[in-house]
Amino acid sequence: MAGNKEFGERLRHLREERKRSNPAFSLRKFAQKSGISATFLSKIERGEFDPPKADKIIRMAELLDVDPDELLALADKVDPDLNEIIKEQPKVLSKLLRTVRGMSADKLHELTDWAHRQRNV
């Protein structure tokens, strides 16, 4: 497997950071709580193996108390919920994503706030 060094390094950094104050974040314990083997986790963190499936990444993010989308993006994966939304209207959503590409974070927040208001009208 090709692996994903950036994902592995970020995952290790987050886990090690938490391990300083909580032994539950040792490689073995974290792997067990994430639903994968310690060997697999070790190889992921070293960039030797590809990241696990999205559901495992989401579980890891929950344990690490980070935004799952951050880890999913690093792993080049999409949240299964978002996948379902995209399948509902693929052409419109593809057009929307291409249109907003390159917009500033502030503009994107304005757009999502506007969309949220429209949805609740």
Per-segment meaning from a language model:
Residues 18, 48, 75-79:
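The DNA-recognition helices of helix-turn-helix-type DNA-binding domains
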Residues 76-121:
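Interfacial/linker helices and their anchor residues that mediate assembly or domain coupling
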Residues 38, 54, 71-84:
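Amphipathic alpha-helical "recognition" segments
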Residues 15, 45, 56, 75:
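DNA major-groove recognition helix of helix-turn-helix
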Residues 1-23:
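A short, Lys/Arg-rich alpha-helix, primarily the initiator
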Residues 20-44, 73:
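Short alpha-helical DNA-recognition segment
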Residues 35, 53-70:
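DNA major-groove recognition helix of helix-turn-helix/homeodomain DNA-binding modules
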Residues 12, 28, 58:
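Residues within the helices of the helix-turn-helix
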